[in-house]
Structures are given as structure tokens and as C-alpha cells.
A protein has these predicted regions:
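A structural signal for short loop-to-beta-strand junctions that line the ligand-binding cleft
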Residues: 1-2, 6-9, 31-71, 101, ...
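Early extracytoplasmic/lumenal segment of secretory-pathway proteins
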Residues: 1-18, 318
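Hinge/lid segment of periplasmic solute-binding proteins
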Residues: 12-62, 78, 87, 113-116, ...
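Short, solvent-exposed loop/beta-turn-alpha elements that line the ligand-binding surface or hinge
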Residues: 28-42, 102-108, 124-145, 193-204, ...
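Extracytoplasmic/periplasmic solute-binding protein
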Residues: 49-50, 54-58, 63, 87-135, ...
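Short helix-initiation/N-cap motifs at beta->coil->alpha
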Residues: 83-88, 161-175
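Glycine-centered hinge/linker elements that transmit conformational signals in sensory
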Residues: 89-91, 132-162
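C-terminal lobe and pocket-closing loops
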Residues: 186-201, 212-304, 334-336
Length: 337
């Protein structure tokens, strides 16, 4: 995609990946094509940055809670609404002897782990950067509270949690090892399909994302997935590609046929039971993942620098100091600071 000419005419992007594509000047504005060929596309699908349409979104996503209804009922545990309640519920499940590691989330070192920090920090009301600048702003009480909650949850998870991505925790769930889990909404389809233990499938329920630290917005971020078009391709290619993808991204038949595969942003979508996590997140006022040019550098620093804290090798304050130092070095290199 970053060759000239580009090998591909389109690329699927999301909140986190569109900004680097723009920074490298790899994608083109779509305003003219939207005017010409976008009649089926809703305004809410148009991702506008600095006044220009840079992507057309077709689905929404977030991470939210999944729970085993049978396990919670057996132990008289209410459906958790906060991460503090998730911890208490997990401790009760462990004490009952039903499960040794009742909680799971994608804590794989790197991108996944950083995403868990991002969610929890936003839930605590954190702002990643000092107002109006690219100066980091995580080495504070909210950052420490975020790390402490991640540590509590990790202690209730499989000891190999630092290797567990979304696929690995899905396997843990389907094996009956886990009763509470934070996972992407887009994964619900495979958890609720006919494969695997029918008793576990039947007892698998979805609810909104949890809040944390007395906050009133979810400790979660809203995401969109959409298509962008390569700048380094002929205009005729861009036009043909846009027409094909705009047809797909406004296709009511597709949305009806695949209604339970995703939370579609396409007109005519009727949310089903698998959409509950995203719908609840929106109702609760979840914030979108930050579309800031320097956010990728912060995300990268978090994914590598908080591991030692979770392993008990350094303090929360030291870990946050390390994150800021790693971020500052990269941000200076790339001219953000």
C-alpha cells in the first residue's frame, strides 16, 4: 500500500490506523466520489477529518463483558456493572472452587495489552496528552489506578495471560475455564454459534462494558471499520474501487443476510442479540478510540513498557515513567515534540 504506485487500490482502516495512513499521505479524500456515487451511504458512515471525507465506515465495534449465566446464578452473583464488581465476582467464583482463573481479557503483550490500558484509563477519566499538545499525560493518579486494576484482573486470569490474544481467550471460554470475559463485540458470532459445548453456548450472555473507579462512562472505546482509497493509484482505479465498495457498504440485502455477523452502520440494519455490547456502549456514552496522530506511538509504548509492572518487577509509577520516556523518544524522532 505504501509503494508508488500502490499495489492495492483500497485498504480497510479503523480509528487507530487511519491517522498513520494520512500522516504518510497514502490515502485520498473521497468527497467527490461520495457526491457522485455515494447515494446509499449514510452521513453517519462518513469519516471526516479536517473537513474532508477520508473513509467510509461500515461496522462498529467495542470491547464489552461476556458472562456465564449459569455460574453467576449458582453462586447468587449479580451481573457485574463495574470492574470492581468483576473482581469481586471473580474472587467469589474462585473461592467456590468452580474455576481457578475465572476472568479473561486479551492481555497479550503489545497491541492487545495497550488497548486494555487505553480502555481502563479512559474509564478513569484520563487524557493521554496535555491539553492542546502531544506532551504525555499518563504518569498520574489515574494512570496508577489503571495499572492497579489491570493487575488485579490479571491475578484472576490464566497465568499465561501475557500470551493471550482474543482468539486464545475465546478458546478458554469455549473450554469452560472462564465465567467473565472482556472481548470484542465482533467475536460474539463465533461464541454463540452451534459449534462447541451446547451448555456453554446456552449459558453465554452479553452485557455492556463495565465502568471503573466510580466513573460514569464505560472503560471501553468505540471503534469503526471502514474503507480508504490509495492516493498513489490512477483516478480511474479509485473511481471503480469506490463504486464497488460503496455498493457493498450500503447493501441492505447483505445487512439483512449477515445481521448477526457485525454491528453494521449500513441503513436498514436491525440490531440482534449479538449487538447488545456495542448498543449499550453507545447508550452509556463510550468515547471513540482517540484519532490523534501521535496516539499510535503512545499505544506502542504502553504495549511494551507496562509488562514488567504486571510481572511484579517494578512499581506502577516506574512503569508509567518508562512509557512516557519511550513515547517521548519516538515522538521527538517523528517531530510531534
Amino acid at each position: 500500500f505504501d509503494c508508488n504506485p500502490s499495489e492495492f487500490s483500497a485498504r480497510i482502516a479503523a480509528n487507530s490506523s487511519i491517522v498513520p495512513l494520512m500522516n504518510q499521505d497514502l490515502i485520498r479524500p473521497l468527497d467527490d466520489l461520495v457526491k457522485k456515487y455515494g447515494k446509499g451511504i449514510q452521513d453517519s458512515q462518513l469519516i471526516t477529518i479536517d473537513g474532508k471525507v477520508m473513509a467510509v465506515a461500515f461496522m462498529a465495534n467495542t470491547q464489552h463483558l461476556y458472562y456465564r449465566e449459569d455460574v453467576l446464578k449458582d453462586l447468587g452473583i449479580a451481573i457485574p456493572k463495574t470492574y470492581e464488581e468483576v473482581v469481586a465476582a471473580s474472587e467469589k467464583i474462585r473461592a467456590s472452587g468452580k474455576m481457578q482463573y475465572p476472568y479473561a481479557a486479551a492481555y497479550k503483550a503489545g497491541w492487545n495489552l495497550a488497548e486494555e490500558f487505553v480502555n481502563m484509563f479512559i474509564g478513569h477519566g484520563g487524557e493521554f496528552f496535555k491539553s492542546g499538545s502531544a506532551e504525555p499525560n499518563i504518569n498520574n493518579a489515574k494512570g496508577v489506578a489503571t495499572l492497579n486494576m489491570l493487575k488485579k484482573l490479571s491475578e484472576l486470569s490464566n497465568p499465561d495471560y501475557l500470551t493471550h490474544d482474543s482468539e486464545a481467550i475465546k478458546v478458554e471460554w469455549e473450554s469452560g475455564n472462564v465465567a467473565l470475559m472482556t472481548l470484542w463485540a465482533s467475536r460474539s458470532g463465533t461464541l454463540l454459534d452451534d459449534e462447541g459445548d451446547p451448555n456453554i453456548t446456552k449459558a453465554t450472555k452479553l452485557t455492556g462494558p463495565a465502568t471503573v473507579g466510580g466513573g460514569n462512562i464505560p472503560a471501553a472505546t468505540l471503534w469503526w471499520d471502514g474503507f480508504t482509497l490509495a492516493k498513489n493509484r490512477p483516478d480511474a482505479d479509485a473511481e471503480a474501487t469506490f463504486r464497488a465498495l460503496a455498493h457493498a457498504a450500503s447493501n441492505k440485502k447483505m445487512v439483512a443476510d449477515a445481521a448477526d455477523q457485525a454491528v453494521w452502520l449500513v441503513e436498514g440494519f436491525v440490531p440482534g442479540p449479538k449487538s447488545i455490547g456495542v448498543i449499550e456502549a453507545v447508550k452509556m456514552g463510550a468515547k471513540p478510540y482517540p484519532m490523534l496522530p501521535q496516539m499510535g506511538l503512545m499505544h506502542g509504548a504502553l504495549g511494551s513498557e507496562i509488562v514488567e509492572f504486571l510481572q511484579g518487577k517494578e512499581s506502577a509509577e516506574q512503569a508509567l515513567k518508562d512509557v512516557e520516556a519511550a513515547y517521548i523518544s519516538k515522538a521527538k524522532e517523528q517531530g510531534f515534540l
